From Swiss-Prot:
Gene3D superfamilies: Cytochrome Bc1 Complex, Chain C. Keywords: Electron transport, Heme, Iron, Membrane, Metal-binding, Photosynthesis, Thylakoid, Transmembrane, Transmembrane helix, Transport. PROSITE patterns: CYTB_NTER (PS51002). It is found in: Cellular thylakoid membrane. Belongs to the cytochrome b family. PetB subfamily. The 4 large subunits of the cytochrome b6-f complex are cytochrome b6, subunit IV (17 kDa polypeptide, PetD), cytochrome f and the Rieske protein, while the 4 small subunits are PetG, PetL, PetM and PetN. The complex functions as a dimer. This is Cytochrome b6. GO terms for biological process: photosynthesis; respiratory electron transport chain. Heme 1 (or BH or b566) is high-potential and absorbs at about 566 nm, and heme 2 (or BL or b562) is low-potential and absorbs at about 562 nm. It is a multi-pass membrane protein. Heme c binds at C38. GO terms for cellular component: plasma membrane-derived thylakoid membrane. Heme b 1 binds at H103, H205. It comes from Prochlorococcus marinus (strain MIT 9313).
Length: 218
């Protein structure tokens, strides 16, 4: 018989946390699982690093065409460890994309996309698209020459789509040309819309993996 604290007993009575803990800690792991099955988890870690460092940078970044570049320069040169925070953000972004690509290849080569895991694969593909969108929107935020022309090119791509192309370009840019409205939209996408979308699909992805388990060997 084990002694438990009153606090533990209080939560146990209402939430049955011991059953939850047992379920989490006793999940069966197939013997064929190796280090390559950790690529999805590494991608998640990279996202968490992205979230933490990105949140830290929002304290100093100013999303205006006149102050964006100077605020990034201030972060890099005057803020204590600001250069490190931004560098870690950039490095982990590259690492996240690399781990995502390797994870997709691993799942495809081991047949993890087959029945009954089709929806798990679909949510993974959606998350891959969102991850690339993070890169596109984040690249523009310093609003330097590279960022400006990248936005101009990327936001003009939908113009090739019949009927709705011009509307989509104007929606992305916030007008006929690239400017303050464009930067505001990309900043909103990068810091609010895309993180929430990724979190929702990530939760769905993990719940389905938890329910169906890890796919077997080929």
């Amino acid at each position: 018989m084990t002694n438990s604290s009153p606090v533990y007993d209080w939560f146990q009575e209402r939430l049955e946390i011991q059953a939850i803990a047992d379920d989490v800690s006793s999940k069966y792991v197939p013997p064929h699982v190796n280090i390559f099955y950790c690529l999805g988890g590494i991608t998640l870690v990279c996202f968490l690093v992205q979230f933490a460092t990105g949140f830290a940078m929002t304290f100093y970044y100013k999303p205006t065409v006149t102050e964006a570049y100077s605020s990034v320069s201030y972060l890099m040169s005057d803020v204590s460890f600001g250069w490190l925070i931004r560098s870690v953000h950039r490095w982990s972004a590259s690492m996240m994309v690399l781990m995502l690509i390797l994870h997709v290849f691993r799942v495809y080569l081991t047949g993890g996309f087959k029945r009954p895991r089709e929806l798990t694969w679909v949510t993974g593909v959606v998350m891959a698209v969102i991850t690339v969108s993070f890169g596109v929107t984040g690249y523009s935020l310093p609003w330097d020459q590279v960022g400006y022309w990248a936005v101009k090119i990327v936001s003009g791509v939908p113009a090739a789509i019949p009927v709705v192309g011009d509307f989509m370009v104007e929606l992305l840019r916030g007008g006929e040309s690239v400017g303050q409205s464009t930067l505001t939209r990309f900043y909103s996408l990068h810091t609010f819309v895309l993180p929430w979308l990724l979190a929702v699909f990530m939760l769905m992805h993990f719940l389905m993996i938890r329910k169906q388990g890890i796919s077997g060997p080929l």
